[in-house]
């Protein structure tokens, strides 16, 4: 294991030059202190967990000190926000400190969010508040634990620095880890500014460092797009299967790696509602839960447009047609597993559709339903769950078909339970739980957020004594809409 001073930087993106990013020094927070850290994320850098207890830890991740081999830079990009093109966005409050290479030879971007003003801050102050930093930390690590690809979060550093949003709040910084911070919007920026030479340079860079298997392909740029499309389809399938609503699927928030990126007003479904909108600012429901699939397709079309100088339009269009079948196959496989099926049958998609329709009509808790379905043999489980539904006739018909389908699977009931518990979490990050932990942290009590993080890092385990985190939300805690302000 390494100490903080032993981290090895090799800053490949910085070497692309000033056309792609601008060198900026972080602006330190006042009186920094550690709020919460992830040992699992620290392990990605081979960091000794004891390093989090050192004063240097908070100093490095609050802008007070910086590694001599780090090269903090703000990246430039653009993007479509709520369907409209914004010509220049860029890192307005975050800095790519550099790329750390671990013992396995893996590269990890260290990105300090809330590090102060940059040339791309526009009217913003470059800061992040404690509230949004905790939310991103919890979600990043929880999604990873659920098996949903995501950027990672090393730590949150709090401070005495005041930041003004709807009200005065405490400033904070989040240290985000990801193999790459390149977004769809990076390519859009160079396409729409007609910098096609730089666009090609960026494409060659990301293929060389992130998709080296494509280097020998006769059409690497086309295969890059296809790979991004495949990864995005798989990601969205996992979002939909586990009830995750991102809330701000702008193209500048879409990763080329197919990982969940840039957390804002996200939410997991409480009661199942396909039309759920988690973003208070999303008046039209563009980024509602049920729209995430078509929006991902739309965003991929925006990326495809940016690649037209190097890939034929016909080829891009044909590739776009792969998205929905890939998504549907991945989603159906996940949902089968959530229902306890290890084999495929032709009627499975319709069985799942009927279930979701019944859940929608009765406002059934999405996470608890699947967990409880695996607690007992199928016939006993559906009898227990029946009381959650309003349309009893419809549910009874579905339950009969489900039990018959389960019987055709055969197998040991104990093995079925283990199989289902491995894919159906007991614990999910509900917004009201995050809010309670945030309110305690804002008063200086970090124990609740640390405990919540620990529980959510093992979402499939029973964890005796932590059952309160698996309870149904109170009425006030359901369907919370979160502001974009952060």
UniProtKB/Swiss-Prot annotation:
<feature type="binding site">
    <location>
        <position position="183"/>
    </location>
    <ligand>
        <name>ATP</name>
    </ligand>
</feature>
<feature type="binding site">
    <location>
        <position position="253"/>
    </location>
    <ligand>
        <name>Mg(2+)</name>
    </ligand>
</feature>
<protein>
    <recommendedName>
        <fullName>Protein nucleotidyltransferase YdiU</fullName>
        <ecNumber>2.7.7.-</ecNumber>
        <ecNumber>2.7.7.108</ecNumber>
    </recommendedName>
</protein>
<dbReference type="GO" id="GO:0070733">
    <property type="term" value="F:AMPylase activity"/>
</dbReference>
<keyword id="KW-0548">Nucleotidyltransferase</keyword>
<keyword id="KW-0808">Transferase</keyword>
<feature type="binding site">
    <location>
        <position position="126"/>
    </location>
    <ligand>
        <name>ATP</name>
    </ligand>
</feature>
<keyword id="KW-0460">Magnesium</keyword>
<feature type="binding site">
    <location>
        <position position="93"/>
    </location>
    <ligand>
        <name>ATP</name>
    </ligand>
</feature>
<feature type="binding site">
    <location>
        <position position="262"/>
    </location>
    <ligand>
        <name>Mg(2+)</name>
    </ligand>
</feature>
<dbReference type="Pfam" id="PF02696">
    <property type="entry name" value="SelO"/>
</dbReference>
<comment type="function">
    <text>Nucleotidyltransferase involved in the post-translational modification of proteins. It can catalyze the addition of adenosine monophosphate (AMP) or uridine monophosphate (UMP) to a protein, resulting in modifications known as AMPylation and UMPylation.</text>
</comment>
<feature type="binding site">
    <location>
        <position position="113"/>
    </location>
    <ligand>
        <name>ATP</name>
    </ligand>
</feature>
<keyword id="KW-0547">Nucleotide-binding</keyword>
<keyword id="KW-0479">Metal-binding</keyword>
<feature type="binding site">
    <location>
        <position position="176"/>
    </location>
    <ligand>
        <name>ATP</name>
    </ligand>
</feature>
<feature type="binding site">
    <location>
        <position position="90"/>
    </location>
    <ligand>
        <name>ATP</name>
    </ligand>
</feature>
<dbReference type="GO" id="GO:0000287">
    <property type="term" value="F:magnesium ion binding"/>
</dbReference>
<keyword id="KW-0067">ATP-binding</keyword>
<feature type="binding site">
    <location>
        <position position="125"/>
    </location>
    <ligand>
        <name>ATP</name>
    </ligand>
</feature>
<dbReference type="InterPro" id="IPR003846">
    <property type="entry name" value="SelO"/>
</dbReference>
<feature type="active site" description="Proton acceptor">
    <location>
        <position position="252"/>
    </location>
</feature>
<keyword id="KW-0464">Manganese</keyword>
<dbReference type="GO" id="GO:0005524">
    <property type="term" value="F:ATP binding"/>
</dbReference>
<comment type="similarity">
    <text>Belongs to the SELO family.</text>
</comment>
<feature type="binding site">
    <location>
        <position position="92"/>
    </location>
    <ligand>
        <name>ATP</name>
    </ligand>
</feature>
<feature type="binding site">
    <location>
        <position position="262"/>
    </location>
    <ligand>
        <name>ATP</name>
    </ligand>
</feature>
């Amino acid at each position: 294991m390494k100490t903080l001073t032993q981290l090895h930087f090799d800053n490949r993106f910085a070497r692309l030059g000033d056309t792609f990013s601008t060198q900026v020094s972080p602006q330190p927070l006042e009186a920094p202190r550690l709020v919460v850290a992830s040992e699992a994320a620290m392990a990605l850098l081979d960091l000794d967990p004891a390093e989090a207890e050192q004063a240097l830890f908070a100093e490095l991740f609050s802008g007070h000190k910086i590694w001599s081999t780090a090269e903090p830079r703000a990246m430039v990009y653009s993007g479509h926000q709520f369907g409209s093109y914004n010509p220049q966005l860029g890192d307005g409050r975050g800095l790519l400190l550099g790329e750390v290479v671990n013992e396995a030879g893996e590269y990890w971007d260290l990105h300090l969010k809330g590090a102060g003003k940059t040339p791309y801050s526009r009217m913003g102050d470059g800061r992040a508040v404690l509230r949004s930093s905790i939310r991103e930390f919890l979600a990043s690590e929880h999604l990873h634990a659920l098996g949903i690809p995501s950027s990672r979060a090393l730590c949150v550093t709090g401070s005495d620095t005041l930041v003004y949003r709807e009200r005065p709040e405490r400033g904070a910084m989040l240290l985000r880890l990801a193999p790459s911070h390149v977004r769809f919007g990076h390519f859009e920026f160079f396409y729409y500014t007609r910098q096609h030479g730089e666009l090609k340079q960026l494409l060659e860079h990301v293929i060389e460092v992130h998709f080296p298997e494509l280097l020998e392909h006769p059409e690497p740029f086309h295969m890059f797009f296809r790979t991004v499309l495949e990864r995005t389809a798989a990601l969205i399938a996992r979002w939909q299967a586990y009830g995750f609503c991102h809330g701000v699927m702008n193209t500048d928030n879409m990763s080329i790696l197919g990982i969940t990126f840039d957390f804002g007003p996200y939410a997991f479904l409480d009661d199942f509602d396909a039309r759920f909108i988690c973003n208070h600012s999303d008046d039209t429901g563009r980024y509602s839960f049920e729209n995430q699939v078509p929006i991902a397709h739309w965003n991929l079309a925006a990326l495809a447009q940016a690649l037209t100088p190097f890939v034929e339009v016909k080829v891009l269009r044909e590739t776009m047609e792969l998205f929905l079948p890939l998504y549907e196959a991945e989603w159906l496989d996940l949902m089968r597993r959530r229902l306890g099926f290890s084999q495929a049958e032709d009627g499975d998609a319709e069985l799942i559709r009927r279930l979701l329709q019944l859940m929608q009509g009765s406002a059934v808790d999405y996470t608890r339903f699947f967990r409880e379905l695996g607690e007992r043999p199928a016939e006993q489980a559906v009898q227990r769950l029946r009381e959650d539904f309003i349309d009893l006739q419809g549910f009874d018909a579905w339950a009969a078909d489900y039990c018959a389908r389960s019987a055709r699977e055969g197998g040991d009931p104990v093995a079925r339970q283990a199989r289902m518990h491995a894919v159906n979490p007991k614990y999910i990050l509900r917004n009201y739980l995050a809010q309670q932990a945030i309110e305690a942290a804002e008063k200086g009590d970090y124990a609740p957020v640390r405990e919540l993080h620990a529980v959510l890092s093992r979402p499939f385990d029973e964890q005796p004594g932590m059952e309160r985190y698996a309870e149904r939300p109170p009425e006030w805690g359901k369907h919370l809409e979160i502001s974009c302000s952060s």
